[in-house]
Structure formats: structure tokens, C-alpha cells
Amino acid sequence: MTIIASIITLSNPKQSTTGSVSTVSAAFKFGSNSVSCGGSSGSGSGLLGGNKGLLGLLGGLGGSPNSKVGVNIGGGMGPQTGSMMGGGQPNYCGCN
């Protein structure tokens, strides 16, 4: 997990000002998203996938844009996702 975290951190160095509050350890926060809060607005990357994320093609955990609650698993299709299963839907709260 540490290696994956390092790769994602290097690939997504920018931190988001939205969706950054997390009840879990800061070690689980990568790029512009946190595990508990999903993602940032716009084209921010999701955790292990997400909106145009590093592992978007593999799906998995992906933060949705403007998400405030929960972890978005998988996600929908469309320009917001970056892939069929990677990432989530805009303004989505909860577990998708």
C-alpha cells in the first residue's frame, strides 16, 4: 500500500481544498481526495481510480467530484469518470 500511495502521491501532487476532511488517517489521503470524503470538484483525481484517476481503467475506489460523504466505489460512466468503472458522479454523496 505504501508503494501505491507513493506512486499516486507523485502522480497527483496537488491537494484539494474541498473534500479534504477525513475521519481516517491522513496516510490514506492521495492526490486531491481522501478516503472518507471522495474528491474535489472539476477534474480532480480519485483514489485508486476516480475522475480521470491514475488507475481509472481498473475502477476500484474512486472519489466523486464534490462528494462530501462516503467512499465512491466504482462509479458511473461519462466524461466525469475517465473510464467505465473508475470514478464517480458529480455532486454525489454516499457510496455509489
From Swiss-Prot:
Disulfide bonds: none annotated. One of its GO terms (biological process) is sorocarp development. Coiled coil: none annotated. Belongs to the hssA/B family. PANTHER family: HSSA/B-LIKE PROTEIN 1-RELATED-RELATED, HSSA_B-LIKE PROTEIN 1-RELATED. This is HssA/B-like protein 25. The gene is hssl25.
